[in-house]
């Protein structure tokens, strides 16, 4: 393979043609600072507008400083990344950016996590030399996302991920020069636009121009109310990301997390993995029902069946492809199944009125906040899930309580809604839902033991993956996509009548829930995402039970309460319907 040799800070780098200076420097351990640049190779996300100019370097033979993110390496190039001229230029550029930024670091929601704040510290900015006209304050919020355009530095990361990666197109920069501002179409409230609340804009924003709508205060008020019984459920992807905020990145911290939640004052600590196993029973049964009818010649059956665990994906269908709503599984997400079971089964069992039984969820996802607020997910005005918080919010709460997380003892989830299998664990990564479904659907359909449990062909970070699973002579074609841009390709095939698949798993976030919009910030580190996925697969492999239908807690729930998968009570509590939510855009007069 042809390579290019160049010298960066007296070190030799050898890179592929087309590599820019930021990547070339990184390959030999030199970090060139950037604000706008972001490159997630395997997830298909690259933002390199060259607008922040923080990455300027000296290139021998050139008069002007060159932006490293926009400069392609050439043979024999000599580059210097930290000369006095370069450092002075970076400091001046950053001081000018800060002149248009509110001085609210101490009270900012991203204090300690802000890339702009970190860069000011690293570049030794100790005074505000310049004072410019700041952006006009503009606040906008939905149940999931808060936009504060006063803190926007126009890096365009959110615009790239929303338009190019997710193909949602809810955000774009309008205006020119000093009047440029990031906004929605016609500057409508984000709640009324085609935004699907996936939170990927929040995940890549270097400042707090975009953040989750925090519900920490509501949780703390509920915990302090002696008249309330407060239970918490935690999603599988939370346990492999929470540790990052406490120096344990890429590791599963399940036992420490459950201990921390008890110390925060939750009366019961449960596992959303239990509800993930329940989801497989319902969704897997629905798949077999549709598949058997389809294979028997009934072409009125909506095939392929598309998973419905991800609220960002469900919202994408409702807002962009509402005509394909019938292809979505009617099964609720694990979060909402848990809420329905907690309020309608566990609360009566404990003799507690459902309005005094508060269900809190800890999710890797900001879209779960909007999902919990959907009016159909409740009874007589009382929601099944009262409050949803993100992994980041839980980390803040643990800090509020002055815990030394690393030294916490390990503990287990409470029963009966804390028992789970390995199949429920892998819901947290792309491909995990369909792999879990196959483990159960195969054995229910064929009445035989699955020859292998690990479907490695379904794993990885390729945007679209497919496989054919032999159900004892019946070839079942399944497909996986993560990231809504990849999902759009599959959905357009379905709409055109060209989809060859029987079942499709889709996660809105690239990488699945491990890269959810509510997770600790990855800052462009793809290796961190891989380690999160590996930690989930390791926890799955270590489980004594790895198939959802083998979960004794699930078996008892059906025997005592639900009856059978997709039965009358299951349909009432665990299934839903979808709506045409396509926004009608009317220009303001």
Residue ranges and their predicted role:
Residues 5-8, 102, 143-145, 185-187, ...:
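A short, structure-level motif marking secondary-structure boundaries and short turns
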